[in-house]
């Protein structure tokens, strides 16, 4: 990167991604692993995970619309939060008053177990040293113990904000500058649960969601998103995974999902589908699995695999 401000620098990075989608008639399963070093990716384990999920999703049943307790696996939580974050934690969106943060900074709006940062320096992710304007990366607290703390900035949005506002090193590629600064390295602090099974045990009656599909932003100021579950949705009964479910349509206010969180796994996963509408990108979200008291199902789709 070379800029008119006098910066000139380069960085080299690598990333390795293994994705597996196992499908038969009426059943499917998905798994992924991402790391900056290929030695840390195990394609065999990814394939086995996807096959096991697919095996368990055969003969899926339906679920009535309603508000359910849920456990979201890391793939599901990662996608949900990345969509939410791009409109919520953007300094430009905040300036234009189209962010959920507008008028709420400093307020506790999420469960106190929830802490979120943008951290492109974390070696567990896909580290970057500077952004597309040459500004050094830094860890940016976004939510601390449920309290809304801030947003990310690039040079134009920081200048527009005025005062002492500085870029946080979140300028996007030139072709995407219209979106303003973006939090490319979402990181959610893990909790106390030692496994996903431990989270499932917290839910007497609810659903487990492996992965999401075709998300869309409905109302950014309220953080409302809609989409479908896919590749492994199950009913939870008496703290155990029970029968598989067809793909479900959901419409959720992400703040509601994060407002009452019984638990999060201690371990975090680098969630990254590696492509967005066929465009390759090397970004991901470091996220745990999460148990939530509210996940709103609004309809059903086809069986897994469709």
Where are these regions (language model features)?
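N-terminal small-residue-enriched
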Residues: 1-306
């Amino acid at each position: 990167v070379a800029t008119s401000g006098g910066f000139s620098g380069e960085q080299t990075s690598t990333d390795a991604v293994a994705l597996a989608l196992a499908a038969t008639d009426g059943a499917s399963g998905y798994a992924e692993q991402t790391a900056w070093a290929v030695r840390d990716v195990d394609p065999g384990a990814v394939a086995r995970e996807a096959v096991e999920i697919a095996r368990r999703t055969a003969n899926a049943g339906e679920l009535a619309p309603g508000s359910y307790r849920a456990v979201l696996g890391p793939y599901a939580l990662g996608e949900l939060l990345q969509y939410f974050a791009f409109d919520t934690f953007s300094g430009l969106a905040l300036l234009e008053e189209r962010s959920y943060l507008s008028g709420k900074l400093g307020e506790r709006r999420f469960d106190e177990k929830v802490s979120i940062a943008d951290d492109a320096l974390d070696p567990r992710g896909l580290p970057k040293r500077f952004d597309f304007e040459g500004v050094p990366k830094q860890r940016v607290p976004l939510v601390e113990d449920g309290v809304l703390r801030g947003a990310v900035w690039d040079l134009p949005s920081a200048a527009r904000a005025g005062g002492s506002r500085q870029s946080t090193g979140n300028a996007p590629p030139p072709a995407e500058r219209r979106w303003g600064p973006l939090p490319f390295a979402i990181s959610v602090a893990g909790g106390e649960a030692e496994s996903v099974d431990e989270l499932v045990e917290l839910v007497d009656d609810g659903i487990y969601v492996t992965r999401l599909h075709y998300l869309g932003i409905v109302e950014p100021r309220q953080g409302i998103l809609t989409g479908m579950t896919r590749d492994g949705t199950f009913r939870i009964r008496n703290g155990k995974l029970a029968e598989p479910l067809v793909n479900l349509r959901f419409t959720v206010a992400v703040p509601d999902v994060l407002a009452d969180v019984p638990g999060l796994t201690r371990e975090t996963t680098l969630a990254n589908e590696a492509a967005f509408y066929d465009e390759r990108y090397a970004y991901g979200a470091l996220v745990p699995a999460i148990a939530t008291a509210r996940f709103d199902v609004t309809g059903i789709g086809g069986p897994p695999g469709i």
